Each structure stands twice: as C-alpha cells, then as structure tokens.
C-alpha cells in the first residue's frame, strides 16, 4: 500500500495530513497489518490512526459487514452511508454469481437500495464485489450516473490485483499483491469460488516487516491444496 489510502494512513501517524479535509472517506475492512517496528505499535493504534481519516471526511462510505464498522463510525459528525452483502445497508449486492468464461474469471450481481442495477465485473471474487460497491456508492454521492458507473465497473482492472495473465486455455494464471495473511486468505478463497480442479500457490514475503507476518502467511498453505 504505497499509494492511495494506505499511504494516507501512514502519513496520519506522523500528522502529515493535518488540515486536509477529504470529500469522501471509504472504509473497506481492518486486519492485523502495518504493526511492528517502524510501523504501528499495536492493533489499537493502527485502528485509531485509520479512524482519523473519517473524522476529517465530509461523507463516509462504510462496509456494513465488517466487524469494526461500529468502532469506525462512533461519534462521527459527518453523514455515514453503508454498503455490503449480508447486513441491511444503503447499497447491497444480491444474487452473486461467479463465472469462468473465455474472457476469464468474472462475477455478476444485482444491486438493491439506492442503485438498482445488474453489475458485471471482470475482477473476480467477493472482495471485488465489496470494492465495487464502495466505488459505486462514492460515485453515486458525487453525482455520477448509474449508467456511467455500470459501464466503468464492467471494464475496470488493476494491475497486480487478481490480475489474470492469459497463457493457456487449459489453466488460469493470476497475479496478486497479497502481502499479508488477510489478503492471501482472501485471494485463496476468491479462487476457490471458481471451483478449480487444482490450485497451485507461489508466494513470497516483503522484507523489513514483522516476522509474525511470515508465519501467518505460511499457515494458510493448507487451504490452497
């Protein structure tokens, strides 16, 4: 997370974004990350640092399914809007279908709430359903039309984020920046949703991080077999 919100969280620890007000703060989830020498001293410090983004946002879009969403929204003055799959929320995904076609791994779903539409993503898995819901809700709050949102989501892709590399029609190759246990587990579960006959996992760990991160990632090998 060298850019974007991940970078903002790091800067907040050193008060480098003091005085900046964000139009919209988006919360996806919170996991044991960025904790160790040179980063955050504890999970609580990390969570509190992350929450400061929403204390300086004019509007907040938050994942209603995440177990820390109550902590993140407590005592906020700005309006809070929700998205999700399981809990009642303002924009909700239903009837999710995971597909493997000649175009690769896709996912389609229906939205209810503010936006009622059929969404097709070429970035696979439940994690990207959540990401697209967050983007959809923020775009809606900024006045972007449902048609533009739908067309954009259908074509969006991010290099290094469940990025498919077309090598053969007999198997799929996916590259992902799964740099901790939470993201690696999410990746494995995403690929399992497409019911592969075999799943081969090749991964490494970034340097200058807590050794605990390596142990946690290694413990996930059994679910990829």
Where are the predicted features?
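Active-site beta-alpha connecting loops in nucleotide-dependent enzymes
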Residues: 158, 184-185, 189-224
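Acidic, Mg2+-coordinating active-site environments of NTP-dependent enzymes
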Residues: 12-172, 196
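Structural alpha-helical scaffold elements that stabilize or flank donor/cofactor-binding regions
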Residues: 1, 18, 53, 220-221
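Switch II (G3) loop of P-loop NTPases
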Residues: 7-11, 173-179
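Single conserved hydrophobic/aromatic residue that forms the stacking wall/gate
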Residues: 1-9, 221-225
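Active-site flanking residues adjacent to catalytic metal/cofactor-binding acidic residues
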Residues: 62, 175, 203
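Short, glycine/acidic-enriched loop or turn micro-motifs at the edges of active sites
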Residues: 32, 66, 178-180, 207
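Conserved acidic residues
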Residues: 6, 23, 58, 176, ...
